[in-house]
C-alpha cells in the first residue's frame, strides 16, 4: 500500500451537520476501497487566496491514508462529482524521505493532540 494525503475544500455555505456528513462520505469511500485512514485534520473555514466557483471562503480538511493505487482514480472521480467539494488535491508519497515525512506528519498530529480542533487562521485582508 502506498502513502497518500488528500486535501479538499468544501463550500462555506454548508451547515456543520452537512460538513460532517461530507467528511464521513469521503472517509467511507476510502475505507470501502481498502484504505487505512491514519489521521483526519479539520483545518476549519479559511479565506481562499482567490475565488473558486464564486466562493471566497472554504472549509478545509486533510486526510492521511494508506491505500492501493487503484483507489486513487475512484477517489478523484467521487471528489469531482461531489458538488459540495470546490477543490481537492491528492499527494502521493513515494521515496523514503517523503514517506518518513508522511509518517511524521500523520503520527505527530495524532500524538500532539488527542482531539484535533479546527485551527484559527488570522483573517487575511
UniProtKB/Swiss-Prot annotation:
CDD domains: bS6. InterPro entries: Ribosomal_bS6 (IPR000529), Ribosomal_bS6_sf (IPR035980), Ribosomal_S6_plastid/chlpt (IPR020814), Transl_elong_EF1B/ribsomal_bS6 (IPR014717). Gene3D superfamilies: 3.30.70.60. It comes from the Bacteria. PANTHER family: MITOCHONDRIAL 28S RIBOSOMAL PROTEIN S6 (PTHR21011), SMALL RIBOSOMAL SUBUNIT PROTEIN BS6M (PTHR21011:SF1). Binds together with bS18 to 16S ribosomal RNA. This is Small ribosomal subunit protein bS6. It comes from Campylobacter jejuni subsp. jejuni serotype O:2 (strain ATCC 700819 / NCTC 11168).
Amino acid at each position: 500500500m502506498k502513502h497518500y494525503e488528500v486535501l479538499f475544500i468544501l463550500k462555506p455555505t454548508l451547515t456543520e451537520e452537512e460538513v460532517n456528513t461530507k467528511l464521513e462520505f469521503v472517509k467511507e469511500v476510502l475505507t470501502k476501497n481498502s484504505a487505512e485512514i491514519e489521521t483526519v485534520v479539520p483545518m476549519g473555514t479559511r479565506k481562499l487566496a482567490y475565488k473558486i466557483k464564486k466562493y471566497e471562503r472554504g472549509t478545509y480538511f486533510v486526510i492521511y491514508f494508506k491505500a492501493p493505487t487503484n483507489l486513487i482514480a475512484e477517489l478523484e472521480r467521487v471528489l469531482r462529482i461531489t458538488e459540495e467539494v470546490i477543490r481537492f488535491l491528492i499527494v502521493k508519497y513515494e521515496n523514503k524521505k517523503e514517506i518518513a515525512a508522511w509518517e511524521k506528519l500523520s503520527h505527530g498530529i495524532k500524538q500532539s493532540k488527542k482531539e484535533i480542533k479546527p485551527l484559527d487562521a488570522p483573517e487575511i485582508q
